[in-house]
Amino acid sequence: MEKIFQNVDIKPLLIDFSNPFIKNAAKKLFQLEEQLPLVPVNVMMDFKGINRATVHGLSRVLQDEIPNYMLDIKPGGYKIEDSTDLFMTEQFVRNRINFIPIYAENETLVFALRSLNNSCEVKTIYSRDLIQVAGPKLKYPIFNPTFEIGFLQPGKSLIIEDIYIKKGIGRKHAAFNLAVKTHFSHLDIEQYPTDKKEYMALSGYKQSSMTSDPRHHRLGLCFPAVPLPRINQVVRTYLKNACRVIIGRIQNIQKIYENFEEPQPELVLFSMDEEKTKAIITIKDETHTIGNLLKTCIYEMIPDISFVGYQCIPHKQEMVLTIIHKASQEDLITLLEKSIQNIIQIFQTLEKNIDERIA
């Protein structure tokens, strides 16, 4: 298989200390003389030879379907009796803490916030005011000191214990999002000039991406908190992890039909007539991301297939894949296996290309 990962552009968003206004503001507010330990990183990638659903799947997984970390407050951690500023409610402060971008590798660290305003002015509480109270000594900070957590009126206090690191995925809570601002476009579909798009209310492409079958794509995204000394290493790890997550989820589907001769509640196979076979596969806790990827890749591998579609059932937390084809049960399973293997091969190749492209 040819190289899928054609090009990558990695750009950290650094503070422009050459600008006197920015330099003075950074020094006055945060006593900064150098770059912050964590920086947002924009990544632009070009892919070739894969379908639209593959890029969409990678985009969705990188954004909100891959495990990541956030800061949260344990029940009882917000000390109401010791926090005297009525404007700083638990929910207000919790949301601010949740959405501090962090770079964490485990869940062993615990922080606290113990702030008292002894001045005559309103005091702004920043993430730098969080103190570590448990866990191993940090070699590098896991968050920047510049995020606003709350505000204290003169003479008031805010006490929070047990601020811990929580693991989850972005589709359950947006604070877990690994990447943000994900977007992709197709480079092999002719587009309208910018001036025409403005007054003709056009989408941009002269042909629908749903019918033109684009094979050359550009995916852009931003990782909001990457350690400055290890930008390439971290970006490479994130991209490879996304490929492995997709491979793992596809392999879970593979396990359902491996022994299809034995009765399995997740797999239903029956003959509709003498020629057609219908397969219904139920996949637990799966999303449109994998459904769309499977549907597209099965159509590509079996162009004359009668039907392939999927339905996500949120209240059951499952996805149901339906396939109808002019084949025996054994032949249908064989064709499905080839489609699954093709998806796995694509993401294994992509993972290898990432290693080659990002040093």
Swiss-Prot record:
GO terms for cellular component: DNA-directed RNA polymerase complex; host cell cytoplasm; virion component. Gene3D superfamilies: RNA polymerase, RBP11-like subunit. Coiled coil: none annotated. SUPFAM superfamilies: Insert subdomain of RNA polymerase alpha subunit, RBP11-like subunits of RNA polymerase. The keyword Ion transport does not apply. The keyword Ribosomal protein does not apply. Induction: Expressed in the early phase of the viral replicative cycle. GO terms for molecular function: protein dimerization activity. One of its GO terms (biological process) is viral transcription. It is found in: Host cytoplasm; Virion. Keywords: DNA-directed RNA polymerase, Early protein, Host cytoplasm, Transcription, Viral transcription, Virion. Part of the viral DNA-directed RNA polymerase that consists of 8 polII-like subunits (RPB1, RPB2, RPB3, RPB5, RPB6, RPB7, RPB9, RPB10), a capping enzyme and a termination factor. Component of the DNA-directed RNA polymerase (RNAP) that catalyzes the transcription in the cytoplasm of viral DNA into RNA using the four ribonucleoside triphosphates as substrates. In the N-terminal section; belongs to the archaeal RpoD/eukaryotic RPB3 RNA polymerase subunit family. This is DNA-directed RNA polymerase RPB3-11 homolog. It comes from African swine fever virus (isolate Pig/Kenya/KEN-50/1950) (ASFV).
